[in-house]
Amino acid sequence: MGGYVLAIDQGTTSTRAIVFDGNMKVAGVGQKEFTQHYPKPGWVEHDPEEIWASVLFTVGKAITAAGITAKDIAAVGITNQRETVVVWDRETGKPIHNAIVWQDRRTASYCDKLKRQDLEKLFTRRTGLLLDPYFSGTKLSWMLANVKGARARAAKGELCFGTIDTFLIWRLTGGKSFVTDATNASRTLMYNIASNAWDEDLLEILRVPAAMLPEVKDCAADFGITDASLFGATIPILGVAGDQQAATIGQACFERGMMKSTYGTGCFALLNTGTDIVRSKNRLLTTIAYRLDGETTYALEGSIFIAGAAVQWLRDGLKAIKSAADSGALAEKADPLQEVYLVPAFTGLGAPHWDPDARGAIFGLTRNTGPEEIVRAALEAVCYQSRDLLDAMHKDWRNGNGKETVLRVDGGMVASDWTMQRLADLLDAPVDRPTILETTALGAAWLAGSRAGVWPDREGFAKAWARDRRFEPAMDEKTRSGKLKGWKDAVRRTLSAG
């Protein structure tokens, strides 16, 4: 057995498997996209069997690319799209319905009904979350109500509920392990983040039988052993975290006040608040950053639904660019005198507005506006929304360590120097891009590798984190203030109550 660690990164649009060597460098990668199902407007589903097949395929690819065998792998770490719900038969392991994805909005009216019953404060107090279709609990409730016989079977213990990590662990271990980790549990609307246990009162409101829920473990723990028939050898599963928490770990944000932001399909910013459960007054989420050695570390989280997805829209919808890589160069050519704002509320607005009925809009168009100005507006929208999150976080929690805010970034969009410089300018804060951009997979791998004893401990891992480049703010205050005012005006005009 070598110092190799396998990370399975099961995302929203694709599955990636990455083999890291003993020096925490990428040795082999496998990736496979899978089908997005849209049965009705606002509904998004995945086929759990297709996801499972993609995991087997990508793991095989990654091991082959690394030039090793499964016997050389010391441990497996899993990270996953959060909130997405799978329910399967405990005997056969077969799903009873497609997975309902985090983006799915079918339970919006149910969430509104719970709000009218004045239950949002209770859910927020217990879980740190808001009553929004984004989270798992109402999706599970919908499945139990709409799949024939599901609720009765669940009460008898015949069905299992899980986020994607739980389903994959079940399959990888041949049905021997029915477990999740604290970060994934904290996104379900059913987990009490203070007591670190499933909340019986919330389960009763959502009409979810406790018999169908998995055991909750630390992020670095013994989650089971892979079935030897899958990869040719047994491998212990020793690390699990939801994707944004895994990225926080991969960015070595272990100290209070450290902050990371991931720019993928959406944008997710997490601020480490240590052992303090900070209750947001600005509609941010209070969530579990990680739980290690029985100690829970908390975070404030801001979720933006559309980030890289806006660039995809420019490419696939408007045909304004040929590839996402062109966006920074085009934005650089935009007329600096034209102030165009794009509010990408394609599926409503996330934090800190949480307005599912807001709709996208472009403001400031003139006869001279061209593709360059639209592209710049799309990239700037990501930066403006990040500023909204940072402002809300500062209101909720003043930096406890007295240091300036430095944002560590990762995800596909951070390869653009132009976007990262504009982000630093509009945040008025330094932005650090790491040398390893696979931070989500790296975080899952570190959880497993450190548990296996083949990778460094927390302190050693933090020291090994390396910066590729720091982007310092270079915009003058007058220009920045004017731009931020224009953005706030644009957002106000897109809000459903505006």
Swiss-Prot record:
Protein species of origin: Rhizobium rhizogenes (strain K84 / ATCC BAA-868) (Agrobacterium radiobacter)
One GO molecular-function entry: ATP binding
Name of the featured protein: Glycerol kinase
Entries under PANTHER family matching the protein: GLYCEROL KINASE, SUGAR KINASE
Domain of life of the native organism: Bacteria
Binding site for sn-glycerol 3-phosphate: T12, R82, E83, Y134, D243
Enzyme class: transferase
Record-stated family: Belongs to the FGGY kinase family.
This protein's pathway: Polyol metabolism; glycerol degradation via glycerol kinase pathway; sn-glycerol 3-phosphate from glycerol: step 1/1
Reactions catalysed according to its record: glycerol + ATP = sn-glycerol 3-phosphate + ADP + H(+)
Record EC number: 2.7.1.30
Segments crossing the lipid bilayer: none
Binding site for ADP: T12, R16, T265, G308, G412
BP GO terms, sorted: glycerol catabolic process; glycerol metabolic process; glycerol-3-phosphate metabolic process
UniProt-listed Gene3D superfamilies: 3.30.420.40
List of residues binding ATP: T12, T13, S14, T265, G308, Q312, G412
Function: Key enzyme in the regulation of glycerol uptake and metabolism. Catalyzes the phosphorylation of glycerol to yield sn-glycerol 3-phosphate.
Regulation: Inhibited by fructose 1,6-bisphosphate (FBP).
GO CC term (a single one): cytosol
Record: residues binding glycerol: R82, E83, Y134, D243, Q244
Keywords noted in UniProt: ATP-binding, Glycerol metabolism, Kinase, Nucleotide-binding, Transferase
